[in-house]
């Protein structure tokens, strides 16, 4: 079989694309084989590789193709089946596996899918390793099978060690008796594990979008569409609602007043709890350039320091390692706390936020009221199909001129962020300022410029 023509496969969060066009079973086979050879260079015969997947119709097909490639590379595959991405990261780290892989496109539409690898310590592959896998794919026709074939094993029972690990330490401190929780499972990867864990902790659980059919993952539900969760929290008079994305590596919350509690609020509340327990070195949190200025100022008033990384949990993780931080994350709900897990984990984060609510014997709405006021912020996405234009948007002089004008106009009362998405064909425009009129004005101007000169 010929090698994949496009060997720049890895984006900011693995390989992702439209199934049948950018992502095919043939490509998945090549990727599995080449990743198996690269990550399994020093592996013992039949050393395992962890494989998980979300609920998309294409996930079975791609998982089987990956498994064929991995077993051809001489590795045994432990197929966990439907599970959150953090489950794969955890099991990769806590078993003898040489690596792990998750088939999911996270929050993307059902027609997309993706392949996300983990190294033996449970963290995502560094760019250097991704580059080596791409080099192997480039020379795919010259790659030779290992001569020792691996085997494919169904191992869904392994998820219990993951749920025990995230649940047991918290259950020793608190139970969720009296807490009414609504879970929006986005017809995705958390549909089996999240309700079971919350019920085991003692919560009353109401589930939304918990019967995946393969066609509707993330469609008008989950962390990218919060309206159903807000309505359900109000209808059931719940204490809190949690919305996961398709692979459950992120979570957003809704309080009893229907307000969105995003990653900034979660970082502030979790950071404050860790600070009070003397478990937050240097009182340092790593956020991203997308985090709200109101959060940063409030955390400074709390005696802490907020560092900003580029967007992407890998960038957050790198800054956390560089500065010795034990808490970091993104406004979108990717939260990292190395003391409890090696990757962003929506279910783990939801459990800790629920624990903070119960330990404070109050409602999430009260905790939010006592935290900070956000600056008005508006984020708009503009679809730009041309890949080169997306990557090189900074070379667009009319857009740069407009950004300079807006920056001068707002001064220290606001900020602008324009960036290309690493996972979708989008240019993202974010404007933040004290004055909402200023936010609306400059957002409209910038979006119009992107549409005119790039789209």
Curated annotation (Swiss-Prot):
Alphabetical list of InterPro entries matching this protein: A-D-PHexomutase_a/b/a-I, A-D-PHexomutase_a/b/a-I/II/III, A-D-PHexomutase_a/b/a-II, A-D-PHexomutase_a/b/a-III, A-D-PHexomutase_C, A-D-PHexomutase_C_sf, A-D-PHexomutase_CS, Alpha-D-phosphohexomutase_SF
Keyword Metal-binding set for record: yes
GO annotation, biological process: carbohydrate metabolic process; peptidoglycan biosynthetic process; UDP-N-acetylglucosamine biosynthetic process
Names of required cofactors: Mg(2+)
Record note on modification: Activated by phosphorylation.
Residues that, per the record, bind Mg(2+): 106, 245, 247, 249
Keywords, in A-Z order: Isomerase, Magnesium, Metal-binding, Phosphoprotein
A cellular component annotation (GO) from this entry: cytosol
Residues modified as Phosphoserine: 106
Domain of life of the native organism: Bacteria
Role description: Catalyzes the conversion of glucosamine-6-phosphate to glucosamine-1-phosphate.
Record-given protein name: Phosphoglucosamine mutase
Name of encoding gene: glmM
